[in-house]
Amino acid sequence: MYEITKKEREHFMKKLKLFRKIKSILSILLISLLIIPLCSGIGIHAKEKNTESNEYKIYPIPHSVVYDNEQFVMSDRVHVVFEEGIDKATQNFLEEVITDYGKTVVHSEEIVNGETTILLGIKGSNGKADSYINKNTTIKTSDLFNRTDSYILSAKENIISIVGKDTDSTFFGIATLQMMLTTYEDPALRSVQIEDFSDIQYRGFIEGFYGGWDYKSRESLMRFARDVKMNHYIYASKTDPYHTSKWGELYPQSEIDQIQKLVKVGEETKCYYTWSVHISGFFTNLDTSNETAYNERYQKLLAKFRQ
């Protein structure tokens, strides 16, 4: 089965960058043709387009992105400060992003002058990241941290701080940082404040088709889903007999071991694995007026969920 490799993902990002450049060039040419008679306006439009071309390309598009006129270049050594509530998966994701960007991760307790520092925290913790955001930013989104998977990302003066509603929300902020760092080749990063949240609580994909798919391919898609802030993989494979015709039988240990691997991948990527029941099998040939028969099937179903 097809697996999305890291190399293919990088190739896709390069093609996406080329497409963005071509799109920008065509847009500039079109604007120029439209405004040639208005000579006094040419300089203004060129300046606006240039600013737009330097904007970060982040998907899904954040709710609020505000730039200032400053920029900075990340140092070769990047100091990371993790608040106590930041889990290992979130820490690992940041370290992966920094390493892929060609920088060296250094664990620190404080902001380090002269080198880049990245702070990760949780709203209301009063930790390093939370305190920095409270002191150095003004949140513009009403009730930001009452919203689903909300976070704020501030990048300025060699300090990047990401504070989320919880550790998973901070994780999604790192996905935004990853896209910022891969937007363009210029090493200079524009100073920015991003405020974002999800309009949908559950975001992801359902495996419910009748084609064959192996566990390696499932894991590959879960890791890809991480980068675009998906948070659920609902398993409903119609080629799995223990999901369909054998719904009342327990999975053999070999299959449980594979499922456990996907559960672990879900914890690493925040794209959580969710097994779903094929409920039509439960009701096939069942007399719902027979309480004993119903309870017998119900207990079988519970036993399967408890595996």
Residue ranges and their predicted role:
Residues 1-12:
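Short, Lys/Arg-enriched N-terminal segments with co-localized hydrophobic residues
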Residues 2, 26-30, 167-168, 178:
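A short, sequence-level motif marking secondary-structure junctions
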Residues 14-25:
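Bacterial Sec-dependent N-terminal signal peptides
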Residues 41-168, 176-195:
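Acidic, contiguous N-terminal accessory segments
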Residues 8-10, 17, 43-44:
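Intrinsically disordered, low-complexity segments of exported/surface proteins
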Residues 139, 144-307:
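Feature activates predominantly on carbohydrate-active enzymes
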Residues 6, 17-19, 31:
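Generic early N-terminus positional signal peaking at residue ~5-7
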Residues 23-43:
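Sec-dependent N-terminal signal peptides of Gram-positive bacterial secreted proteins and lipoproteins
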